[in-house]
Every structure is written in structure tokens, then in C-alpha cells.
Design a protein with these regions (language model features):
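Polar, surface-exposed loop/tail segments
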Residues: 4-10, 57, 152-154
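Active-site-proximal cap/lid insertion segments
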Residues: 27-55, 61-177
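Alpha-helix/helix-capping structural signal
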Residues: 1-2, 85
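Short regulatory "switch" loops immediately downstream of catalytic or recognition motifs
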Residues: 2-9, 64-70
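C-terminal cap/loop subdomain of S1 sulfatases and analogous C-terminal strand-loop tails that border
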Residues: 3-13, 17-28, 162-168
Length: 177
């Protein structure tokens, strides 16, 4: 999430930049969601086959399953931090199954300039399709918590740094408040 400095896109070696996490599967600023990569404990990237939000959700569920077994035996809690890249742009990069919003059906904000309307409709549809994909993945996480019998004893915190302009006032990302 690049909150600890200007380091972007590279390997984070074990140490203080991992902020105390014992298990690491991370990529900083990889926004090619169908050709993404991440790193574990060595500088060789691991390439993802498929949509990266699905893959990182799979990894988190695997981690939760492993930790739930350890926690039940040792009565120890665990923490998992999952930071999906979508709905960061590019908005059109996703599997066809997630492209569920029709650009022609998008209702634009009234402050989108007329010359930006076609592009804005495409961006809205992609943005909302990414959000739909994340909703499905959050549902998968919650189902895994229930399956593991730990949903009632788990705190799920959902937050986001997104909120792009999507052509409001002719602007694209979050350049202005």
C-alpha cells in the first residue's frame, strides 16, 4: 500500500519494511490485474495466472485455514492483511466474468463534461465491475471464516484509499479533493 516510503514495484526483503508480518505475499503498485506478480521471501517474482484479486483472496483463505488450525490448538489469534489493488485504474483489466456493468447503463455525475461522457461511462462500468469482483471475494473470505468456525470470533475491517474522480470536473484520479 506504499505507506512507508517511496519504494514501489520491487521486492521487499524480510526486515523492518515488512512491518512485523511473519508471512509475506506482496506486490507494490502492480496494476496489470491479469498479468500480475508478487514476492514472498526471495527477489524472484511469482507470476499470477488469472485475476490478481482472486489469487490474493485464495492466498488469504489458505493462510486463514492454516492459522485457524494453529489458533485452535494453541488458543492464539492471528492477523491477516489483504490489500487488493482494484478498483485502482486501469478499470478495463479484468476477466470477462466480472465485466457485469454495461457502460451504456451508467448514470454519470452531473459534473462530467459532455466531451468526457463516453470515456466516463466506460470507466464507471470498469470501476463498478472491479468493486463487484471485490464484493464476491469478500464474500468468499467471510464464507471461509464461517466454514472454519471462526467468523464469530473474527474482526473484519474493510477500508479503501480509492475514490477516483472518474471524469468529474474533467479529472481522472484523485488529484484534487
Amino acid at each position: 500500500w506504499h505507506l512507508d516510503g517511496p519504494y514501489r514495484g520491487g521486492f521487499t526483503p524480510p526486515g523492518p519494511r515488512r512491518q512485523g508480518f511473519d508471512t509475506w505475499a506482496a506486490s507494490d503498485c502492480c496494476h496489470d490485474y491479469l498479468k500480475a506478480w508478487y514476492y514472498r521471501d526471495d527477489p524472484e517474482p511469482i507470476w499470477i495466472d488469472g485475476y490478481d484479486a482472486d489469487h490474493f483472496t485464495d492466498l488469504t483463505i489458505q493462510f486463514m485455514r492454516a492459522q485457524a488450525g494453529v489458533a485452535s490448538r494453541a488458543q492464539r489469534p492471528f492477523c491477516a492483511f489483504l490489500s487488493w489493488a482494484p478498483p485502482h485504474n486501469p478499470y478495463e483489466v479484468m476477466p470477462a466474468a466480472y465485466k457485469v456493468h454495461d457502460p451504456d447503463q451508467m448514470i454519470l455525475r452531473p459534473n462530467v463534461p459532455a466531451e468526457d461522457e463516453a470515456l466516463a461511462r466506460t470507466q464507471y462500468a470498469g470501476y463498478f465491475s472491479h468493486i463487484t469482483a471485490l464484493d464476491r471475494n469478500l464474500g468468499r473470505l467471510r464464507a471461509a471464516l464461517a466454514e472454519l468456525g471462526i467468523a464469530e470470533n473474527t474482526l473484519v475491517i474493510f477500508t479503501s484509499d480509492r475514490g477516483d474522480m472518474l471524469r468529474s470536473h474533467g479529472l481522472y484520479e484523485k488529484q484534487l479533493p
